[in-house]
Amino acid sequence: MAGTYSSGASIGIRGSKVENVITGLAHTGVCVPDCAAAVEFYRDVLGLRVLSPPYVMGGNAIRNDMGELVPDPTMKAAIVGLPDDGDHVLEVIEYLNVHGGDQRSAAALTDYGLSHVGLICEDLDATRAELERKGVQFLVSGIADVARVRTTWFVDPWGVVFILVEKSRPERPYFCQWD
């Protein structure tokens, strides 16, 4: 169930900072029916590194963390990402005792909730061609150029939507490519 929030204040974009609340992004969780198969896809097709191989999490600690969210939160989980990205990783989760569903088949990119995961590459043409050779399904027919950022969209075998981003100015964050 979604909550509501209203501060009654306008939101400033640049220069605003709320102290001691959020200090960084931790990870993006991806729920899959087979953790090992998903790790193979992210490693062999996308080239991500396995930073923590699949392991089973169960018992009181995980029940205390997630027991109100999932009837039996026992899971097999792994972490994939890039070695120098710190906490910016994908947490790959397979719930072992609760059957999930393919909600993505009925979802649209514009639905509320998690929309997509952004990945950066140095050569979008070469990366897209390589992923197409590996059988990745792209959602758009080509490559767009928007605000000095080149993009293309694809989906993984479990319906998670990804955007590939090539920055024109690698030294800047992707959202600060324009002047």
Stretch-by-stretch model annotation:
Residues 1-21, 30, 53, 90, ...:
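Vicinal oxygen chelate
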Residues 105-110:
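Long, charged/polar, surface-exposed segments that mediate recognition or autoinhibition
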Residues 23-27, 111-116:
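Short, solvent-exposed beta-strand edge segments and adjacent coil->beta transition regions
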